Amino acid sequence: MELVKIDINTPSHQAAIIELMNDYMLDEMGLGAPMKAGLAEKIIAGLKEQPNYLGFLYFDGNEFVALANCFVAFSTFKAKQLFNIHDYVVHQKYRGKGYGRSFLKAINDYGAEHDFCKITLEVRHDNPKAQRLYKSLNFEESNPPMYFWSAEL
């Protein structure tokens, strides 16, 4: 298995992002529906415009099996960069084989090697499998506990 840092201008990386995001959207933990027409192009164009985009793919020698779309931010409390894993998906046909764990471990190693102070992510309350995975790799609820809120615009 190989951790691949996404080059958003590479067509094979773009195709993998869209395939894996569609797989995520189809899942009950996503939207439970396929990607809407025209969204793929907007995703790639939008990511190209984000200077803080940091994406990873997991390559098994034949195909990309997992995706993490991350965004770099800055911790004012630690005066160091951090990154948030915004989307994390292992393709459905590769689940239950340890790819999720080894992929996240490789991402953690990347963060440590590149002097990030931490990695953040959000996880649905009704996704105990993901919660177990994250906890097993030393992720924990924020202390003090925090809410993740959003406002549609």
PLM regions: where:
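Acetyl-CoA-dependent GNAT
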Residues: 4-80
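Conserved acetyl-CoA binding element of GNAT-fold acetyltransferases
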Residues: 80-92
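Active-site acidic-Proline motif in GNAT/NAT acetyltransferases
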Residues: 91-93, 97, 125-126
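Conserved acetyl-CoA pyrophosphate-binding loop and the N-cap/start of the following alpha-helix
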Residues: 94, 98-106
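Conserved active-site alpha-helix within GNAT-family acetyltransferase domains
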Residues: 101, 125-144, 151
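Conserved GNAT acetyl-CoA-binding A-motif
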Residues: 104, 111-122
